[in-house]
């Protein structure tokens, strides 16, 4: 799904762009960017982010964040193993949240007063900045104004915006990293309150969550996403409730059972269908776009009906009620390791550098001098005073705040530009574009993916055993014939067999540890017992009994937690093994009914 055009008011967007003016003008020279960041850091200057309120960018140098020993170029950079291409990113500073330091807010404006003056104060001068070495989020600037965000705690790189104008219009509202548990972001979806309270109180196990969902099946929850419109979430609870919505209402029994097998095969554990997100049509049929699934650990996933894929949606009920469908809007903008993405069922990062050859389509961008580029003209065009003016009396007037924007405002998308080659022009221009791509590849080595994104690169001994076990169970004809893989790999996992194999390997590990550390049992052998008749001996025995009872309770809690962690670890290993086996092969997708299947035969 495509984002809305902006999440902030016109005055806030223009103020943010004015704060980024010098970055827009000096973006071609890395030394100028570093000098500008150094000068801002010396003055303790911070730039308020347009959305959400309270966030600001503290300009800090690279050495103050990562240390003087950190590398600024190449694969040894803090983000070198995460970014898809070998592009040099420049650190702008750290992102901080504070409710005390806010920008100067103007009073309410009318449509004519939205033309803010040029003397607005778009910077914040902070007296005390938190230690940048302990900051979690780092803002980075790439080529052609691409904006990136590095989450140092999770080791994840986010592709925030395709330009500084995009960053000014959207801010951090769709950055997944700001909605973590430590931020305590308030819930957006709060109604109906009795349903929300029951869901939050029974999110510890999948059985309790299913019981609550079945209690309210048929109810509609307005699921809210930050900055986007509200979508209806129809609660189901059971698989049979899916047959009342489109397109599952048109599916045969065998086809529907294959779909349920696909859900279990993709999540590698028992699955609960929480509900569907879509639209209620005037005909009375609910049109489903996404199916919300819950796995054993009460983590949420979505099944895209049109793409026939399953990906991660939220880590918990609270996160689902906070971010809504944010991951669907930001699909492909999260860059991490292949094994972790396979375990979490995250959408792999989609390389945004594919459009760079389009920018260099005439082979002249690298030859043009920096002084002759039209960055100043672009900046003046972006902050023009009539850009966000709303005139209701002009019904035929269109501006850049409309959903369908002009070419100048979304020129980053090649599909919208009229000079992008269409299908009829591809054959005659194929040779020219091939020569152009070769020229671009020779000019810069940062085009094309250079990172080996493969599950096989991060193999562990546990994962290798899971891959071998999975390869032995998969029917050979399913891997050779993609048409037979509608319901997945047709593998039914057995926890008992995997427990036996893990116990065998763990026993060997325990024996090795005991042989290496024989002094663990010395204390029990050399302890001298007290005389049974003395008062001190009775008190000591009672104290020992109480300690043993408390230790037994703690041991049971630890075993229960370890059992849950082991079960979840087993599920994650299954997902990574499944991704490793299917790497380089067609992805299994279930068969879904087409519009022809539910239309009358005369149509």
UniProtKB/Swiss-Prot annotation:
Residue ranges with Polar residues bias: 517-533
UniProt-listed InterPro entries: US22-like
Compositional bias per record (Acidic residues), positions renumbered to this chain: 496-513
Region (Disordered): 496-536, 549-568
UniProt-listed Pfam families: US22
Family assignment from sequence similarity: Belongs to the herpesviridae US22 family.
Record protein name field: Protein US26
Source organism per UniProt: Human cytomegalovirus (strain Merlin) (HHV-5)
Lineage start: Viruses, Duplodnaviria, Heunggongvirae, Peploviricota, Herviviricetes
């Amino acid at each position: 799904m495509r984002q809305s055009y902006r999440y902030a008011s016109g005055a806030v967007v223009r103020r943010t762009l004015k704060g980024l003016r010098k970055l827009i003008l000096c973006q071609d020279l890395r030394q100028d960017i570093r000098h500008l960041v150094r000068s801002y850091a010396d003055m303790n200057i911070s730039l308020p982010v347009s959305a959400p309120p309270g966030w600001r960018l503290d300009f800090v140098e690279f050495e103050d964040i990562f240390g003087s020993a950190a590398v600024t170029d190449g694969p040894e950079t803090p983000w070198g193993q995460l970014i898809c291409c070998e592009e040099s990113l420049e650190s702008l500073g750290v992102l901080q949240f504070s409710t005390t330091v806010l920008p100067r807010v103007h009073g309410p404006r009318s449509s004519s007063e939205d033309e803010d003056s040029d003397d607005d104060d778009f910077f914040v001068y902070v007296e005390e900045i938190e230690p940048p070495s302990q900051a979690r989020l780092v803002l980075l600037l790439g080529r052609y104004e691409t904006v990136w965000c590095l989450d140092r705690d999770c080791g994840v790189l986010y592709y925030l915006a395709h330009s500084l104008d995009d960053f000014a219009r959207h801010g951090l509202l769709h950055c997944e990293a700001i909605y973590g548990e430590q931020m305590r972001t308030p819930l957006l979806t709060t109604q109906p309150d009795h349903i929300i309270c029951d869901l939050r109180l029974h999110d510890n196990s999948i059985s309790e969550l299913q019981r609550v969902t079945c209690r309210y099946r048929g109810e509609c929850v307005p699921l809210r996403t930050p900055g986007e419109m509200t979508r209806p979430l129809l609660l189901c609870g059971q698989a049979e409730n899916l047959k009342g919505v489109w397109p599952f209402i048109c599916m045969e029994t065998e086809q529907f059972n294959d779909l349920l097998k696909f859900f279990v095969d993709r999540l590698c554990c028992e699955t609960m269908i929480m509900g569907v997100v879509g639209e209620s049509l005037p005909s009375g049929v609910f049109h489903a776009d996404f199916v919300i699934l819950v796995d054993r650990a009460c983590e949420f996933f979505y099944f895209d009906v049109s793409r026939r894929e399953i990906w991660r949606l939220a880590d918990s009920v609270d996160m689902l009620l906070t971010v809504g469908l944010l991951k669907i809007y930001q699909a492909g903008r999260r860059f991490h390791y292949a094994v972790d993405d396979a375990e979490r069922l995250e959408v792999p990062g989609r390389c945004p550098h594919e459009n760079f050859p389009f920018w260099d389509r005439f082979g002249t961008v690298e030859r043009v001098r920096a002084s002759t580029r039209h960055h100043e003209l672009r900046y003046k065009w972006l902050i023009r005073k009539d850009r966000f003016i709303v005139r209701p009396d002009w019904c035929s007037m269109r501006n850049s705040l409309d959903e369908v924007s002009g070419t100048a405002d979304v020129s980053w998308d090649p599909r919208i530009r009229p000079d992008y080659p269409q299908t009829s022009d591809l054959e005659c221009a194929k040779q020219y574009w091939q020569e152009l791509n070769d020229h671009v590849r020779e000019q810069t080595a940062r085009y094309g993916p250079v990172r080996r994104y493969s599950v096989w690169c991060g193999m562990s001994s546990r994962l290798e055993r899971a891959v071998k076990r999975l390869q032995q169970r998969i029917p050979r004809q399913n891997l050779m014939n993609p048409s037979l893989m509608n319901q997945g790999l047709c593998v039914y996992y057995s926890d008992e067999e995997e427990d036996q194999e893990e116990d065998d390997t763990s026993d060997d590990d325990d024996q090795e540890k005991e042989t290496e550390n024989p002094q663990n049992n010395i204390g029990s052998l050399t302890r001298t017992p007290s005389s049974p008749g003395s008062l001190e001996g009775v008190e000591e025995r009672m104290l020992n009994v109480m300690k043993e009872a408390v230790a037994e309770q703690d041991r049971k809690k630890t075993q229960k937690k370890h059992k849950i962690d082991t079960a979840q670890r087993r599920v994650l290993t299954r997902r990574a093994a499944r991704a490793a086996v299917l790497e380089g092969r067609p992805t299994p997708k279930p068969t879904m009914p087409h519009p022809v299947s539910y239309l009358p035969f005369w149509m």
